Regions:
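Residues embedded in well-ordered regular secondary structure
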Residues: 1-3, 39, 47-159, 197-200, ...
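Non-catalytic, largely sequence-independent nucleic-acid-binding elements associated
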Residues: 5, 225-227
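Conserved catalytic network of the ASCE P-loop NTPase/AAA+ motor domain
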Residues: 12, 34-35
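Transmembrane beta-barrel strand/turn architecture of Gram-negative outer membrane proteins
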Residues: 16-18, 36-63, 142-215, 245-281
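GHKL/Bergerat-fold ATPase module in large chromosome/replication-associated machines
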Residues: 221-223
Length: 281
């Protein structure tokens, strides 16, 4: 076998997996060396079957929905009452006190008018991902081959976030009278990831429910007053998503694994492996 990162396991076609074995402690160390002292997860994929040419296609659809049940936040009225109880609208300075009272009156007016923004849901959506896999296999007792084409589209629950992957794999094995066995597997993957422009989710958890998302004209409000009686303001996290910025990652990886087995006799076996990988961003 060959050592791969977790991302490779995540991208595996589940229909191509034959078995999963967990090795611990001494057994893992004996086979894979000191790096496996804490254990190894061995994933065995299905070998190409001999016989007539076979073509298989699989489609997997995954639906991801955000779970906000662990968030227990105050509604607009409760948040305003908590701020009053905490003394946020009290000051020993007359000018500051007047400004704080005006802020409180404005927020109370909004609460009474029905403003109660549930900010947690604003940057989220139900994401529907799909995975396509086309596999071609065939051969005879001596030569077997397998060709794998796959495409994954994985949108995130944060709006406009995604991870898309296209991969090609080619496996060729040659068995000479059950004495010599050659195997070579070449895989090429192209991955593109996009982070959500809607920023950090904690900004939405910290936003005040008595603030509106849009003004009376339906335009997105850019910023809001802070809790203190100053000119300081904080940005509407939804407004940041309208700014022209991107956070994307794209790379192409090449991996070629070659192994050789020579069954000298019933007691001796010679095995060699060569692996090469390259990644370009």
């Amino acid at each position: 076998g060959y050592e791969v990162d977790v991302e490779k396991i995540f991208d595996l076609n589940m229909d191509r997996i034959e078995s999963v074995t967990i090795l611990k402690d001494a057994s893992a160390t004996a086979i894979y060396g000191s790096r496996a002292a804490n254990g190894v997860v061995v994933v065995t994929t299905k070998a190409p079957q001999e016989g007539q040419l076979r073509v298989s296609y699989n489609l997997n659809v995954a639906i991801s929905a955000p779970d906000l049940s662990d968030y227990h936040l105050l509604n607009a009225r409760e948040k305003l009452e908590a701020e009053v109880a905490g003394g946020l609208y009290e000051s020993e300075y007359m000018d500051t006190q007047q400004k704080l009272r005006m802020d409180y009156a404005d927020r109370l007016k909004r609460v009474k008018s029905g403003v109660d923004t549930y900010w947690l849901s604003q940057p989220l959506e139900v994401a529907v991902g799909h995975k396509h896999s086309l596999y071609v296999e065939g051969g005879d007792k001596s030569i077997r081959y397998g060709i794998d084409l796959n495409y994954q589209a994985n949108p995130g629950v944060m709006k406009k976030s995604s991870r898309d992957r296209f991969g090609v794999g080619f496996l060729l094995s040659y068995n000479l009278n059950n004495k010599l066995l050659f195997r070579n597997k070449l895989t090429v993957d192209k991955v593109k990831s996009k982070e959500s422009p809607y920023g950090s989710f904690r900004d939405y958890a910290a936003a005040n429910p008595y603030e509106r998302v849009h003004d009376d004209e339906g335009k997105l409000i850019e910023s809001y007053d802070t809790h203190v009686a100053t000119t300081a303001r904080y940005l509407n996290p939804l407004y940041e998503a309208t700014l022209n910025h991107k956070d994307e990652t794209a790379y192409t990886s090449w991996t070629d694994n070659f192994d050789f087995d020579w069954f000298i006799n019933d007691h001796f076996r010679l095995k060699a492996k060569v692996a090469y990988s390259e990644r370009t961003d």
